[in-house]
Amino acid sequence: KIVIGPVFHESLTYLDEMKDLTFLSLTNKTLDLPKNVISAGINSTSQFNTIKKFLETNKIKRTIFLTPIQDYEFEVKKGMKNSKIKIYKDYEYNTEPTKITKQIEEITNYKVRKRNLDDEINRIKNSNDPNKERKIKRLEKRYTLGGLNFDAVVISDFKENLRSVTTSLLYTDVLPKNKYFITLNQW
């Protein structure tokens, strides 16, 4: 006998005691399921498989992964492992808003790139370049100077935390016109 439901992972407790039933649950969680429960929801593995295909199709080689230290962190890590997605670098971050920006600054080498810009402006100011005023004006419109060592960022977060991470990326001069921003569907 097959039962469709329950919907939520929290409702799966004690279902393993009903040995003669199989439950087709709409939960997207895959960790610690009773043996007689089949997860039919969109889970992290299915999402990472789709992201993997996107990265391969677009020939994106260096992808960093940002995973919050949250209660679903292990679900995300399991999805990454099961999908066999290529990981350039994997970072875990604290979701406290004041800490996110500092961590993103470190991940993106913001201070080094900011210093590169200041050094270049000073170098041009002290040069004999006839176009130095125009060059300085153009540089002063920027926040940083120098490349990033990744092509895409996968953010495994949702709601306000996702907004905080993307805002921190923009603040550190990581722009979606230059880098792919990829997020998971909330589950």
Regions found by a protein language model. Name each.
Residues 1-31:
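Beta-alpha junction/loop-to-helix N-cap segments that form part of ligand/metal-binding clefts
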Residues 3-6, 64, 154, 182-183:
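Soluble periplasmic/extracytoplasmic beta-strand elements of cell-envelope proteins
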Residues 8-12, 28-32, 69-73, 95-98, ...:
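Solvent-exposed loop/turn segments at secondary-structure junctions
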Residues 10, 15, 152-170:
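Hydrophobic alpha-helical
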Residues 18-20, 33, 83, 177:
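Short, structured coil segments at secondary-structure junctions
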Residues 24, 38-40, 182:
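Hydrophobic/aromatic beta-strand patches that form the interior of the parallel beta-sheet core
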Residues 38-158:
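Extracellular/periplasmic Venus flytrap/periplasmic-binding protein
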Residues 173-187:
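Venus flytrap/periplasmic-binding-protein-like
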